[in-house]
């Protein structure tokens, strides 16, 4: 990050880092505005655009949580996977998962990659290559690598990797009145209601994200 930040910009950047460390995902514009006393999310948006121009973050247009922290020392997004100083944690990269087989079965692991453990809220167990755009508005895009910590339980509202029948999907978990729903973050996709007769299991919770392609 070559350009010096203003005091307010640094406050916003610190808030983004703290939120990512706590939840695994960045805050919304409304959450930034509320936390820092802005009159509207538009004020937060102006500061975010300034941070993006200065190279501190990347923004995904149209996504409420589409904020990506940049790697220090102006490394490119793909350098998070290859830069020797950042490659302190080696994780299996899981591609497509075959029906009925364990997610970390050897045939699903495309390769192992080295990553900076400081990128994540909690230490992940594996990376999952994202397929599709159903979680776009959470800033999770096609081809991104979702950092996942294995877990059989999750809190309401967490983004999870779930197995439903023969499919593995990334969605936001919602439990309400004894019913489980898997919610997309894109209005083009419908929520998935888990029936009592469905084979359902949690494979893990999302603790961070790596973008391998630059935003356009």
UniProtKB/Swiss-Prot annotation:
Q: Which InterPro entries match?
A: LexA, LexA-like, LexA/Signal_pep-like_sf, LexA_DNA-bd_dom, LexA_repressor, Peptidase_S24_LexA, Peptidase_S24_S26A/B/C, WH-like_DNA-bd_sf
Mention any Pfam family matching this sequence: LexA_DNA_bind
Which species expresses this protein natively? Bordetella pertussis (strain Tohama I / ATCC BAA-589 / NCTC 13251)
Site note Cleavage applies to 99-100
GO annotation terms (biological process): DNA repair; DNA replication; negative regulation of DNA-templated transcription; proteolysis; SOS response
Tell me the protein family, please.
Answer: Belongs to the peptidase S24 family.
Quote the subunit structure annotation: Homodimer.
Per its record, the protein catalyses:
Hydrolysis of Ala-|-Gly bond in repressor LexA
Q: Does the keyword Transcription regulation apply?
A: yes
Q: Key word Transcription regulation present in the record?
A: yes
Q: What is its EC number?
A: 3.4.21.88
Q: Which GO terms describe its molecular function?
A: DNA binding; serine-type endopeptidase activity
Where along the sequence lies the DNA-binding region?
A: 29-49
Q: Which residues form the active site?
A: 134 (for autocatalytic cleavage activity), 171 (for autocatalytic cleavage activity)
Under what name is this protein listed? LexA repressor
Q: Which UniProt keywords apply?
A: Autocatalytic cleavage, DNA damage, DNA repair, DNA replication, DNA-binding, Hydrolase, Repressor, SOS response, Transcription, Transcription regulation
- What role does it play? Represses a number of genes involved in the response to DNA damage (SOS response), including recA and lexA. In the presence of single-stranded DNA, RecA interacts with LexA causing an autocatalytic cleavage which disrupts the DNA-binding part of LexA, leading to derepression of the SOS regulon and eventually DNA repair.
């Amino acid at each position: 990050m070559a350009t010096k930040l203003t005091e307010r910009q640094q406050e916003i950047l610190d808030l983004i880092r703290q939120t990512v460390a706590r939840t695994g995902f960045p805050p919304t514009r409304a959450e930034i505005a509320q936390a820092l006393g802005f009159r509207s999310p538009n004020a937060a948006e102006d500061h975010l655009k300034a941070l993006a121009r200065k190279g501190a973050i990347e923004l995904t247009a149209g996504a409420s949580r589409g904020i990506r922290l940049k790697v220090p020392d102006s490394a490119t997004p793909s350098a998070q996977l290859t830069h020797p100083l950042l490659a302190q944690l080696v994780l299996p990269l899981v591609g497509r998962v075959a029906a009925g087989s364990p997610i970390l079965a050897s045939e699903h692991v495309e390769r192992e990659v080295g990553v900076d453990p400081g990128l994540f809220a909690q230490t992940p167990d594996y990376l999952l290559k994202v397929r599709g755009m159903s979680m776009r508005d959470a800033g999770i895009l096609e081809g991104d690598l979702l950092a996942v910590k294995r877990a059989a339980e999750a809190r309401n509202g967490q983004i999870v990797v779930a197995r439903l029948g023969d499919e593995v999907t990334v969605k936001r978990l919602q439990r309400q009145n004894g019913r489980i729903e898997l919610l997309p973050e894109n209005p083009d996709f419908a929520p998935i209601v888990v029936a009592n007769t469905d084979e359902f299991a949690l494979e893990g919770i999302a603790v961070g994200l790596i973008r391998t392609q630059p935003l356009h």
